[in-house]
Amino acid sequence: MAAEYEAGQASAAFEVRDPVLVRMASRPRGTALAGVDAADPVPGARRLAADPVLGQAVRVASGSLAHSLDRLTGDEGVAALGRKRTLSAARTLTRYARRAAARPTPFGLFAGVGRARFGSAAKAEPGAGEVAVRLDGAWLRRRVMAWLAEPSVRRRVDVVLNDLCFVRDGRLCLRTGGQERSVRDNALVGAVRERTRTLVGYGDLLDTLTRRFPSLDAERLDGQLAELVRRGFLLTSLTPHRIDTALLDGIEAVLDEALPDDARALRDIRAACARHERDSPGAGGESWHRLLDEVRRLDVSDTDGDAQARPPVHVDLHRRGEFVLPETVGREVCRYAGAIWSITPEWTTLAHMRDYRDRFIERYGTACAVPLGELADPHRGLGLPPEYGAEPTYARTGPGDEVDGPRRAFVGELIQEAVLSGGDLVLTDEVVRRLADVARHDPEAAPPRGLELCFQVLADSTAALDRGDFRLLGSPHIGAWAAGATAGRFAEAAGLTADLTRLATETSGDPDGDVIAAQVELLPREPRGLNIVQVPRLLPYRIPVGVPDDRDDPRCLDWRTLLVAAGSDGLRLLHPESGRPVRPVLPHMLALDAQAPPVARFLMDLATARPRVWSGWDWAGHDTLPYLPRVRYGRVVVMPKRWLPGRRLRDAARAKGAEVWEEGLDAWRRRLAVPDRLHIARNDQMYPVDLRDRWDRELLRSELTALHPQFVCYEDLTADGAGLGWNGGHSTEIVVPLAGARPSGGAAGTVDEERLRTAPPVRPAPTRFHCRARTGCSSSGTRSRRPTNPCSRITFPPCSARSRTTSTAGSSCGTRTPTRICGCASTATWRR
């Protein structure tokens, strides 16, 4: 009876929402591909490159590989490449060809996206592929910065001070890309700061400064302002962060007056993009070359070689067909999501935010709200979590690994049983109940408001789907904590904007309208990341971070003024004027630890970090084992079988001669019972190999001899198209948005939200008010000029801080690391 109750509770924790995104490989699995002979790779590489769809897909993906393939067409080009580069090109081309059939991850023309719905009868009609083209973010940013170097262009734009700037020790500082740059905060810079708090015309700013500083001529002032623009202290209305029709129209309007020839060239590029979109995939070779010619005619002359190797346009593939999945698939996804939620321990994900909250309470207490701009400054506040830097400055607090011992022991027992029996690790209802017991979490904790999960659908036919004869294979891209994030960048081209707006509103707000859901807008560290963040505005409120915006707009929330306060289970964000909770939303898949400004990452950590965060199956520290069994829950293959290469196999791969390598490979396969068919995987970048084939063994060897080999091997469950018949042999994934079921009636909800509905408005505190804990500390290696009150003049009723007795569980190289659902430590993003 208990097991049935647990299963029912798990199923009721989540509900399916629309839209369901389909990710589909462009080539059917099982299609015979031209083989390559390692002794003479040229003929095989030529046969692969002769495929029109693959050839065009490669040219869209990699300019450098396309150049190598062009050379392979003639003997002189082959001689110029040499054997080493020819082999490298053949390997890369083979990986691309395998990926086009085996991986549904959208990337150029290798895989496309569509939409699906749940219905009574399954249907799979992909329809013809359509190409969507836009200018590459890195190319456009480089070109815009070159235009802004022209005085005639600058005088026709608006500028605003970068909100990531701050003043310290008499200098205006800006942290971007892990580096800090600064200029002396003299009278001129101070006047610029004051005048550019909101958008102002560059020409008006220059005129104002000319009148205020008559001893400086206008040309010199213009040069000073141009340098502030070039170094990022001033953002302009042309600075690309949302590459849409409005931005391109605005650029054209400025260029029409300043540089008419460039304006005509930009219009020609846009027309060439439209012409290429009219061609079907594989048939647009001529329009593609014309498009490249138009773009490169306008390119910056001193572009480095790495930038030239990347195509200057970004291409996506969309499927306008119809996909219908039976309701049983949606119910299976909900059951699985609820089961994993029930066994998720506390603070195994985003554990650094637990420590940060403890430090926050120690310094500010529980009845104090602090402006985020002050809190993030390590000289006035706590600074951002030390994990955002190279090395944590503070030791981990918390109970330690011994608390997780029972869970680790039980998972180890399950692994041992599966390995000894040669079977799978099956998550029965009884196993789920026992895992929930050893997780030692609060069983009453509400599930997350929004979530999305990704699965590959395996069934022999649509009839098999209708009968319930299917499996759902968990994708390496597990999903995202924000429902709809995976579909975000395809919203406009795939016609999903209205659905994603509704989804973001449903999964980010609350029924009473107390919560302000605000879309975070940012500039990635690397300009090429602009291609990922191209999401239309889905929510009425927004939080710009390092991007130009109209800060006079009441729906534009300045992150520096938002208040941070301690809640019962984490930190929360409050609107300074109304005291309403603010929930940041990031509707795309940018890697925050590597690409986002640290403040933007912190905003999302504030929104997500709670004692329990849905984070997928966790091996409880056993993920360094050389072999891990398949994990199943119902019809969901949670994890396929997984093998780590190991030191002995790496040594054999690096040894001279083929004999040592072949012997080492055979020994590894015997020791760990490695099958013939595998997937070689780096996160969600995967391609299949058949270890019976000599060329495939060479592919594996080349992975092992890389400078830092970081990959794992998974069983290939779709070899020769197995389980893909329902969609014509194409590898197909679905990304299913889920909404967490909320407590009804008098059921206990989250303590903070219930209290906030009846709490008095946030109000100014008396000047004599002090926090319970005052520690006027500053960042390590720095000194504050004067002591500061660490508490903002804002108070509200204190919250209850629940004690915690759980520990963290780190990830390892053997874990299938998800794109956004992960608890990995930060890479260096804010160095102190």
Feature map (PLM): residue ranges:
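Short glycine-/aliphatic-rich beta-strand segments at the starts of folded cytosolic domains
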Residues: 763-798
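Active-site-adjacent "gating/activation" loops or surface patches in catalytic cores
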Residues: 158-194, 660, 670, 726, ...
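Long, low-complexity, charged/polar intrinsically disordered regions in eukaryotic proteins
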Residues: 129-180
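Short capping segments at the starts of secondary-structure elements
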Residues: 194-204, 208-216
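Short, glycine- and small/hydrophobic-rich beta-strand elements in well-ordered beta-sheets
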Residues: 804-819
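Type-3 copper protein
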Residues: 1-133, 218-528, 572, 680, ...
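Helix N-cap motif at beta-to-alpha junctions
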Residues: 827-831
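C-terminal structured domains
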Residues: 465-711, 715-716, 733, 737, ...
